[in-house]
Amino acid sequence: MIKKEAPLIALVAGEISGDILGAGLINALKLHYPNARFIGVAGPRMIQAGCETLFDMEELAVMGLAEVVKHLPRLLKRRKQVIETMLAEKPDIFIGIDAPDFNLTVEEKLKASGIKTIHYVSPSVWAWRQNRVQKIARATNLVLAFLPFEKAFYDRFNVPCRFIGHTMADAIALKPNRSEACATLNLDETQRYLAILVGSRASEVRFLAEPFLKAAKILKQQYPDLQFLVPLVNDKRIAQFEQIKAQVAPELSVHILKGNARQAMIAAEASLLASGTAALEGMLCKSPMVVGYKMKAMTYWLAKRLVKTKYISLPNLLADEMLVPELIQDECNPENLAWYLGNYLADDADHRKQRNELKQRFTELHKLIQCDADAQAAQAVVDVLEANTSDQN
């Protein structure tokens, strides 16, 4: 039974992905509490859904150590402002959406003052810096996790966590429509395509564009009819990619797309991609993939010592087996990439059977994480909120 019909709900998002999650959560919460008031730090989608914002979310959207250091005084000032505002407003619940370096400290202060807190999107504590789980325990009443292995990790440490499924799994059809994807991209359906995703960060494009393009050149010799789709997130990445392409593969014809990664992976027979969210999206698009990743030698040396997981790509982590090849650092070379991709492009009966089996596994994993995450997240908030109000009555 709802004890408080017009709760004050605070949310802080720090980047575009968080704004999308926040808007979905607000709209789902309105079904439970039509008179709720939403305050915090919001992007355009959350504002449209009815959230009052203290300042522009863009101020928190900084990436990379150098950028964080440069903006640290402003970030600390904004964090202090959020904490002071929340302590004054005393919301019924505070929900930090991702942005753990900013939100966990806010959550810890608020929880200590008696405000219920939820952290939405688990930090990658299961992969590295596992000691952060102690801070998460101090800072939150509940963690909302996208993936089942994340909940299993928190269970080991007795930290309250609820698996809600992944919003991306809700957004992508179990059987993606290739004809529709080709029409959206203005592509000839009868052609064969390979999607090449070099990552969204400058450093990823710098390290991966060359081996990925050289692999494409090898494949073009083996499959002369093969065409290449290269979705890039913005004009900066497009310019960076074109500059590298002019040096390493000037004669190779590619379709450069601004955005549209999802449609490219649905239209393509296979994908070559950087590890990260793209691998999960590729799995949901049922795109057979090869995952490649390179970084600075020192970064790799550190990562090898810090990362605690058997796999780096989300499809393999979800399946707990090597479903798709992962080629890291020196193994991420054109010859290896082309060889593994060739297994997806070969047209004999054995390879076709392997591809169909892989797509079937992708579909099973899709079903596992397709749970209507917005509604699940809202229900979790309601449960924590009502435990709170019943405690007070």
UniProtKB/Swiss-Prot annotation:
Pathway: Bacterial outer membrane biogenesis; LPS lipid A biosynthesis. Its EC number is 2.4.1.182. One of its GO terms (molecular function) is phospholipid binding. It catalyses: a lipid X + a UDP-2-N,3-O-bis[(3R)-3-hydroxyacyl]-alpha-D-glucosamine = a lipid A disaccharide + UDP + H(+). GO terms for cellular component: membrane. Signal peptide: none annotated. It comes from the Bacteria. Keywords: Glycosyltransferase, Lipid A biosynthesis, Lipid biosynthesis, Lipid metabolism, Transferase. It is an enzyme of class 2 (transferase). One of its GO terms (biological process) is lipid A biosynthetic process. Pfam families: LpxB. HAMAP family: LpxB (MF_00392). Belongs to the LpxB family. This is Lipid-A-disaccharide synthase.
